Amino acid sequence: MANFFSLGGNQEQQHQEISSSQALVPTESNNWFLYRNEHHHHHHNQEIPNTYKGFELWQSGNTPQHQHQHHQQQQQFRHPIYPLQDLYSTDVGLGVGPSRSGFDISAGDHEASRSGFVMMRSGGGGISCQDCGNQAKKDCQHMRCRTCCKSRGFQCQTHVKSTWVPAAKRRERQQQLAALQQQQQGHNNNNNNHKNKRQREDPSASSLVSTRLPSNTNGLEVGKFPSKVRTSAVFQCIQMSSIEDDEDQLAYQAAVSIGGHVFKGILYDQGHESQYNNMVAAGGDTSSGGSAGGVQHHHHNSAAVATATTTSGGDATAAGPSNFLDPSLFPAPLSTFMVAGTQFFPPSRSP
């Protein structure tokens, strides 16, 4: 069933319902009619597509010729062979292109000034782009796709800047970051090595409490020091106690100057002279324990005073120049302790 509803622009706003078989007699040239097509029509075994069904606006003319043209257009859309497929691409098309919702407008070049054709269609979907015919962006106020909208220079909120980076640029950026990290790591390693080297060269920069005395080896060559020396020295008798033994032990400490260098040490009791001579003849160790408890002796420096003669008062006299040193400078071994009133100096470490 096809019905016409008058949408004329006359002052009386007449409403007419005319059957499709009756003649169409408009009152004015500016009248518009709403045509409703509810049936399927076939032409050459072809069915009217769903996009061509719905409401159609028709504008009438003043002469029967216009009526005949409208009747021909009505028959054309009753039995179409997809006539609107290329409507938006023709030079006479005035519409927004094919879309599932919206409206299309087309007018003939011979009557573009007086009559036109408007077709309204219903359905779901979005708006087509006015330039390329693709689906336009939903929120675009220019009714265009993003590419066409940006190419025309329109300021639209749908122009979102893409955060995608090509794979080649990503690899280049990763290589640059890796090279920068390696360079920073190498710079840090060089700084650490330089700092460690400075600490080794400058022992005073160490945070240890005990400082190492610099060792001067100048003049310690064998040619500058004689194998035997006769000199006079003062031997001071001291009483020492061992940590492992409660019994006290007597020892002598002395210091001599040989070749401009000071040699100092403590002489421990090695037992009776006959026993010591037997041990030396037998090849025994002169630093073994004595008769006072078998205490192990350290810093046995008898070479410098091997030729000295010990008296009962603790004084040793020998031929040679008189060179006496303060006995309080003589250190004691770490494994022993001296009686009260005796100063203790730890021995210096040799390199």
Curated annotation (Swiss-Prot):
Annotated family: Belongs to the SHI protein family.
Assembly and oligomerization: Forms homodimers and heterodimers with LRP1.
Keyword set, alphabetical order: Activator, DNA-binding, Metal-binding, Nucleus, Transcription, Transcription regulation, Zinc
Biased composition (Polar residues): 204-219
Ribonucleoprotein found in the keyword field: no
Protein name: Protein EXPRESSION OF TERPENOIDS 1
One GO location term (cellular component): nucleus
GO MF: DNA binding; DNA-binding transcription factor activity; metal ion binding
Single Gene Ontology BP annotation: positive regulation of DNA-templated transcription
Cellular localisation: Nucleus
InterPro entries according to UniProt: SHI (IPR007818), SHI_C (IPR006511), Znf_LRP1 (IPR006510)
Gene that this polypeptide is encoded by: EOT1
UniProt feature, compositional bias: Low complexity: 11-22, 175-193, 303-320
Domain of life: Eukaryota
DNA-binding region as annotated in the record: 129-156
Positions contributing to Zn(2+) 2 binding: 129, 145, 149, 156
